[in-house]
Regions:
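Short glycine/serine/proline-enriched coil/turn segments at secondary-structure junctions
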Residues: 21-23, 67-69, 122
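Short, surface-exposed charged micro-motifs
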Residues: 30-31, 111
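A short, Trp-centered hydrophobic/proline-enriched beta-strand micro-motif
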Residues: 6-21, 59-63
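Acidic-histidine catalytic/liganding microenvironments
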Residues: 11, 56, 93
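Structural motif
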Residues: 13, 38, 58, 76, ...
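Charged, amphipathic alpha-helical segments
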Residues: 1, 43-46, 94-98
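Charged, gly/pro-rich active-site loop segments
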Residues: 72-134
Length: 134
């Protein structure tokens, strides 16, 4: 895998860590897309994770791969509440309709993209290396 996006698509469950006051919070995510030269995730505006990202947009993604590799992406996220980004997310992952039956018209569904992110691939057997996002 040559990019962070490829890694996350091949290993679709990853964890998103945020800050809640003075405590770290992590939870599993499963959606990622490359769109308009940006790496996107999505969530629900009513969830604590979104509120935490609004208050402190510095987050980190961590995903485990095969053969003792793992990926970390650290950076800020910004909201893209455009209909086009939401529509693209449902096009790329129709299973999201099980969670958001109204699709891109769901007012609680939100897409976010990384800004200034650094992706690093780690291994138990070799030195860490930076990867392009996509």
């Amino acid at each position: 895998m040559n990019t962070a996006f490829e890694f996350l698509k091949a290993n679709p469950v990853f964890h998103v860590a945020t800050v809640d006051g003075d405590a770290a919070r992590a939870r599993p995510f499963g959606f990622v897309m490359a769109y308009n030269d940006k790496l996107y995730i999505c969530t629900n505006k009513t969830k604590d994770v979104f509120k935490q990202m609004q208050k402190n947009p510095e987050i980190e993604i961590s995903g485990m791969g095969a053969e003792g590799t793992w990926l970390r992406i650290r950076g800020k996220v910004a909201v893209d509440d455009s209909y086009e980004a939401k529509k693209q997310a449902f096009k790329e992952s129709p299973m999201l309709l099980q969670i958001y039956p109204r699709g891109a018209d769901d007012e609680n569904y939100v897409t976010l993209y990384f800004t200034g992110a650094v992706a690093t691939l780690y291994s138990f057997t070799s030195a860490p290396k930076n990867l392009p996002l996509f």
